[in-house]
């Protein structure tokens, strides 16, 4: 779920309930770090991601030279997106892929993940 704060709920309780409902329906991840998120929002979303079993993502919202104050790979020009976010996504993808192979041993599809970031 990108830009979860933009769901524009009236308060944090409503936002939390909406994110929980989405997680219950199969949501995989939530954008915890974003260039518009204050530290208190990052902490809140991080806690909710843990509580609801969601992967964590982050982004700078970099869209090129039209936003000079935003740097690629950094949120708020000082916070880097943790490598652990990427590693957790890769681990879940590998687990799903392995589960698929166990359920369907004849599956010929493969997953290739380049971890040279």
What are these regions (language model features)?
Residues 1-117:
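Charged catalytic cores and adjacent phosphate/nucleic-acid-binding surfaces used
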């Amino acid at each position: 779920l990108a830009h979860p704060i933009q769901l524009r709920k009236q308060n944090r309780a409503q936002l939390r309930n909406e994110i929980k409902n989405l997680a219950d329906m199969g949501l995989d991840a939530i954008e915890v770090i974003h260039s518009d998120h204050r530290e208190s929002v990052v902490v809140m979303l991080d806690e909710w991601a843990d509580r609801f079993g969601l992967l964590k993502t982050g982004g700078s919202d970099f869209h090129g030279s039209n936003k000079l104050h935003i740097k690629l790979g950094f949120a708020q020009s000082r916070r880097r997106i943790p490598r652990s976010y990427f590693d957790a996504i890769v681990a879940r993808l590998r687990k799903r892929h392995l589960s698929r192979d166990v359920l369907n041993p004849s599956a010929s599809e493969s997953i290739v993940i380049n971890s040279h970031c």
